[in-house]
């Protein structure tokens, strides 16, 4: 286990009051837990700006499955990025729409390229990416 270090933080009273309300609503047991989570999130966001960093995450997308050639194009793109794709989940939302969740692991630069290729396709209605640090 990593050594725990104590440090002090000075903030405005109203900022702390608002923070305390939020962490109480989220169910945190202490400010320390909430601050650790915020620090981790900040570090992950910064890693997203460094092309060579390794991350893991998911890309989710919703698209119309009956658009001619779209499913094949998505499959081709995924085969091209087989080295960063861990797994794919495909769900039929209704008669017209499908959702895919693509689990990824690898360098930021390649995952960004994959995400951009998918999100720029016509008839892909929505895309979202969520990343985390590989610990």
From Swiss-Prot:
One of its GO terms (molecular function) is nickel cation binding. Pfam families: NikR_C, RHH_1. Its cofactor is Ni(2+). Ni(2+) binds at residues 79, 90, 92, 98. Keywords: DNA-binding, Metal-binding, Nickel, Transcription, Transcription regulation. It comes from the Bacteria. GO terms for biological process: response to nickel cation. Binds 1 nickel ion per subunit. Belongs to the transcriptional regulatory CopG/NikR family. Transcriptional regulator. This is Putative nickel-responsive regulator. The lineage of its organism: Bacteria, Pseudomonadati, Dictyoglomota, Dictyoglomia, Dictyoglomales.
């Amino acid at each position: 286990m990593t050594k725990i270090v104590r440090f002090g933080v000075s903030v405005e009273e109203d900022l702390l009051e608002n923070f305390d309300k939020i962490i109480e609503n989220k169910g945190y047991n202490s400010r320390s837990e909430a601050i650790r989570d915020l620090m981790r999130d900040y570090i992950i966001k910064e890693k997203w700006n460094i092309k060579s960093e390794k991350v893991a995450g998911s890309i989710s997308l919703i698209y119309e499955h009956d658009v001619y050639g779209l499913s094949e194009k998505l499959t081709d793109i995924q085969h091209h990025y087989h080295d960063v794709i861990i797994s794919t989940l495909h769900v039929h939302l209704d008669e017209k729409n499908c959702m895919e969740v693509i689990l990824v692991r690898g360098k930021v630069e390649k995952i960004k390229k994959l995400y951009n290729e998918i999100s720029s396709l016509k008839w892909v209605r929505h895309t979202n990416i969520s990343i985390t640090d590989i610990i």
